[in-house]
């Protein structure tokens, strides 16, 4: 039960059948979330920049460009559906890492179809990792959920899952509150915190089970 992000990859191409499965998952998320997320393979340009080296990325040749029409809730939807895709990639044997700032945005834009009114929010580095990644420290439940003494099991499981979620800036700046089966999650600020909130909410749903609660 650890949070891992993989920044170094081996030079192994993603097979066509895996690419097709991933593309199908992306298409489904685009349809459901009103997004324009795109898979970019065999392209090293976006991670061949000073920022990428500063971010300790090595040999990234594939990524998922997280694009959508500009809207107040775009970042949160990008986080939610981007993480859904990242977990699908993991099930297909791939490794990923959320990348908010340390990649070449200009180079990535050239490879993507970004329409008028759309925005490239961030990317997911993708491929076969040299290792299974680096461990990130996680907060305790009491740090993200105050004033809870006797919490139901589904809520505890949801919080445990949320704390294991990777976040775009590795900050875990969020907190949860509950009133019966109505749950609220909010960002406590910082760069890309709305993206992080979407990621965290998706993980909470996996742990808690959507049949047990509703967002408020």
Labelled PLM ranges:
Residues 1-216:
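Acidic, surface-exposed loops and disordered segments
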């Amino acid at each position: 039960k650890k949070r891992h992000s993989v920044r170094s990859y081996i030079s192994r191409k993603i097979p066509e059948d895996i690419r097709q499965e991933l593309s199908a998952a992306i298409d489904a998320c685009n349809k459901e979330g009103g997004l324009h997320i795109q898979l970019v393979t065999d392209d090293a340009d976006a991670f061949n920049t000073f920022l990428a080296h500063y971010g300790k990325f090595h040999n990234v040749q594939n990524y998922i460009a997280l694009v959508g029409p500009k809207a107040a809730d775009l970042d949160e939807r990008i986080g939610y559906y981007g993480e859904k895709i990242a977990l699908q990639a993991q099930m297909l044997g791939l490794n990923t890492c959320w990348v908010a700032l340390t990649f070449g945005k200009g180079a990535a834009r050239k490879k993507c179809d970004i329409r008028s009114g759309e925005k490239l929010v961030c990317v997911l580095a993708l491929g076969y990792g040299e290792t299974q990644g680096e461990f990130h420290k996680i907060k305790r439940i009491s740090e993200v959920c105050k004033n809870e003494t006797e919490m139901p099991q589904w809520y505890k499981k949801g919080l445990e899952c949320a704390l294991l979620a990777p976040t775009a800036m590795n900050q875990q700046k969020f907190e949860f509150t509950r009133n019966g089966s109505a749950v609220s999650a909010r960002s406590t600020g910082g760069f890309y915190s709305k993206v992080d909130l979407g990621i965290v909410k998706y993980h909470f749903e996996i742990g808690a089970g959507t049949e047990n609660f509703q967002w408020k």
